[in-house]
């Protein structure tokens, strides 16, 4: 079996220390499951700017395109707040997503039994929650042209962005969403604002057409984005798979993230088009940011990044058994009462980033025995 090519981009802030714990899991997979990984490490975001004067060096893109999958820690921080817009760390992340053709962002929002009380909502509202939010990643309001800030003849200024989608862009994200729904519970909710925005009228029309022509076995419903935000808080378990536009998905997935109690628990995957062999370019990253306030203090929760690697095994390497093993190990560690600061509960044991990573490795040993 050929070695799996992984590009690791620790990034900024806590990205470095949480990625160190993922390296433990990767090493364990090599030793105990005999999976060979060929690992390259690169720079992205503020760390790249400090070395190269750009948040997105050419060699990082080259390495990403050569890899089977990319693992990212986090980018950004106040250190780089005053940089020009095109030099900010976040431009590196947007750039690599665009150049890798990563159009489908998968954001699971799952409430583990041990953490049902950690949510800000009542346990009975979120217990057993398992939602997959699919966000279109390379079109919509974040990338549409024209965009900019202009100074008008009278001296006032005008800022503008454009919401644009084409039929092929909608169809490709739709197919990923319907396929995910088909593999889960055959329920898909498409979120738009078709009562106001013509672009999302087209979105809704294309989703309906796709369902009729290619996915008649999947139940398709539609919801306006403002109602979807309300329903995620009111009755989140009504949803299974949700699909939506770039900005809507950015907002709704963060809303859904807090149903689980902590951003430190949530992984994500960004996928590109399937090639002739069915393989996709892919980038995996935790939902949380770089958390500069706790960076370097061994306090960060590494579980979202570890679970992102589990998603990598599942979606890029077709290793569902190994992905399940990691997810079960994480569940068991939490059942055992270990908590990082962000998910700390009364009566539980508060541990560091390093100790949490070590605990997951020990649990993997038990499960693999």
Swiss-Prot record:
Keywords: Amino-acid biosynthesis, Branched-chain amino acid biosynthesis, Cytoplasm, Leucine biosynthesis, Magnesium, Manganese, Metal-binding, NAD, Oxidoreductase. GO terms for molecular function: 3-isopropylmalate dehydrogenase activity; magnesium ion binding; NAD binding. Binds 1 Mg(2+) or Mn(2+) ion per subunit. Its cofactor is Mg(2+); Mn(2+). SUPFAM superfamilies: Isocitrate/Isopropylmalate dehydrogenase-like (SSF53659). Mg(2+) binds at residues 226, 250, 254. Catalyzes the oxidation of 3-carboxy-2-hydroxy-4-methylpentanoate (3-isopropylmalate) to 3-carboxy-4-methyl-2-oxopentanoate. The product decarboxylates to 4-methyl-2 oxopentanoate. HAMAP family: LeuB_type1. This is 3-isopropylmalate dehydrogenase. The gene is leuB.
